[in-house]
């Protein structure tokens, strides 16, 4: 899998034979079960992604990742709240040290 940032991509306007921009697909297959209509994942920062952002990302085809800057129970509650709001796929940041195993299991 290739990872890129904004510095790695340059879009140069050119002539195109497409009939309509609506005929293009921006969808992206994350794995066998998850396809994003819009290949954008929100940052798992406490000031960025909680339930409302996860819902907005899903509404527009992206993916929200709930931040880990709270207790394990609070994070699990936020994920459940997003699911109850209708978000079928929501992520949860777990980190790589500390309570990451407990978060992954919650």
Regions found by a protein language model. Give the residues of each.
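An N-cap/entry alpha-helix motif that binds or orients negatively charged groups
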Residues: 1-40
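Alpha/beta enzyme core
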Residues: 3, 9, 48-106
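Short, contiguous strand/loop micro-motifs
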Residues: 39-41, 90-91
């Amino acid at each position: 899998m290739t990872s890129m940032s904004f510095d790695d991509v340059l879009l140069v306007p050119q002539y195109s034979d497409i009939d309509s921009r609506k005929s293009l697909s921006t969808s992206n297959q994350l794995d066998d079960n998850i396809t994003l209509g819009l290949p954008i994942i929100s940052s798992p920062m406490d000031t960025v992604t909680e339930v409302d952002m996860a819902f907005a990302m899903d509404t527009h085809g992206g993916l929200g990742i709930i931040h880990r800057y709270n207790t394990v129970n609070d994070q699990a509650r936020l994920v459940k709240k997003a699911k109850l709001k209708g978000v079928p796929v929501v992520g949860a940041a777990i980190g790589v040290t500390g309570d990451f195993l407990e978060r992954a299991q919650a």
